[in-house]
């Protein structure tokens, strides 16, 4: 473990990002940048360059070893939201509502979502279409901002038969468009569009006043989101078609770890510069 704690987060130099700011940027045509983060260190890394930080339930398959997001619990999400919030990010902090935390009844849903705001989030994100309208309306009525999520919704992986592009059939495309309009009318301040054809996402973006955030939805959305580990190349193996990897983070980290192991085994680490000297008076007393 480190011999000293992380330094406290420095106060942001620019004002915090707010929901009205995102909506104004959408009207101005300024693209919104959103990434995931799951702890304070990640939040400090991304905060200077992004507009929105999503504490996604993707933490389940990215960090916790699950095959999908379904096993992620409310307690797990609370833990990670608290960790990110401790970094005091300037970016808008959005917390994912995990599976079965907004499906059963409205009082529990409001309590679960409100708990995220009490832990430092500014908004929540939830998956689903028209069936979620009563949930969105109830949350918005309680002053809990909601970001919707349509298209390839990972919590529906079993119903969809896998992680498959949505909206390629006429009826499905029409339903996604209609769901987007209904979620906007219900009070969502933004929508994530995942895994749908680029032209369909463009049509939805044009039809809505609120910003759309794309992931695997082409270049015409009001903003884009990627999992941080994907864009930094921190996960080995096959990537989704929509992922662009900007650096071989996995390779760089492996090289650093290999150099550390080599230095330890060769007796080169730690050296004098990483060691503490014994005061002369103490040495004399011990002799």
From Swiss-Prot:
Q: Which SUPFAM superfamilies match?
A: Phosphoenolpyruvate/pyruvate domain
What's in the keyword line of the UniProt record? Answer: Cytoplasm, Magnesium, Metal-binding, Pantothenate biosynthesis, Transferase
**Group of enzyme by EC:** transferase
Per the UniProt record, which EC number(s) apply here? 2.1.2.11
Please name the CDD domains in this protein's record: KPHMT-like
Binding-site list for 3-methyl-2-oxobutanoate: 57-58, 96, 125
Question: What are the GO cellular component annotations?
Answer: cytoplasm
Q: In which pathway does it act?
A: Cofactor biosynthesis; (R)-pantothenate biosynthesis; (R)-pantoate from 3-methyl-2-oxobutanoate: step 1/2
Q: Which residues form the active site?
A: 194
- Cofactor(s) of this protein: Mg(2+)
Q: Which family is annotated?
A: Belongs to the PanB family.
What is its biological role? Answer: Catalyzes the reversible reaction in which hydroxymethyl group from 5,10-methylenetetrahydrofolate is transferred onto alpha-ketoisovalerate to form ketopantoate.
Please give the name of this protein.
Answer: 3-methyl-2-oxobutanoate hydroxymethyltransferase
> What species does this protein belong to?
Methylobacterium sp. (strain 4-46)
Q: Provide the organism lineage as a comma list.
A: Bacteria, Pseudomonadati, Pseudomonadota, Alphaproteobacteria, Hyphomicrobiales
Q: Which gene encodes it?
A: panB
């Amino acid at each position: 473990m480190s011999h000293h704690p992380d330094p406290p987060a420095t106060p942001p130099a620019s004002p915090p990002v707010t929901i009205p700011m995102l909506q104004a940027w959408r009207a101005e045509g300024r693209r919104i940048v959103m990434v995931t983060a799951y702890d304070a260190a990640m939040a400090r890394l991304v905060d200077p360059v992004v507009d929105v930080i999503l504490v996604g339930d993707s933490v389940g398959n990215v960090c916790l070893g699950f095959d999908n997001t379904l096993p992620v619990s409310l307690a797990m999400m609370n833990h990670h939201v608290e960790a990110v919030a401790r970094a005091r990010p300037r970016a808008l902090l959005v917390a994912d509502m995990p599976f079965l935390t907004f499906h059963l009844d409205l009082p529990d849903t409001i309590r679960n979502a409100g708990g995220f705001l009490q832990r430092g989030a500014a908004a929540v994100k939830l998956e689903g279409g028209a069936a979620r309208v009563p949930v969105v309306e109830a949350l918005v009525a309680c002053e809990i901002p909601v970001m919707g999520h349509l298209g390839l919704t990972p919590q529906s992986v079993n119903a969809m038969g896998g992680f498959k592009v949505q909206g390629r059939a006429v009826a499905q495309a029409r339903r996604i468009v209609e769901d987007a309009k209904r979620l906007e009318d219900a009070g969502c301040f933004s929508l994530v569009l995942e895994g749908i054809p680029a032209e369909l996402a463009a049509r939805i973006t044009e039809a809505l006043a609120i910003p759309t955030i794309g992931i695997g939805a082409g270049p015409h959305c009001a903003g884009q989101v990627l999992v941080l580990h994907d864009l930094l190349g921190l996960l080995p193996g096959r990537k989704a078609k929509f992922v662009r990897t900007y650096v071989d983070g996995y390779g760089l980290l492996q090289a650093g770890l290999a150099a550390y192991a080599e230095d330890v085994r060769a007796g080169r680490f730690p050296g004098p510069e990483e060691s503490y000297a014994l005061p002369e008076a103490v040495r004399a007393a011990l002799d």
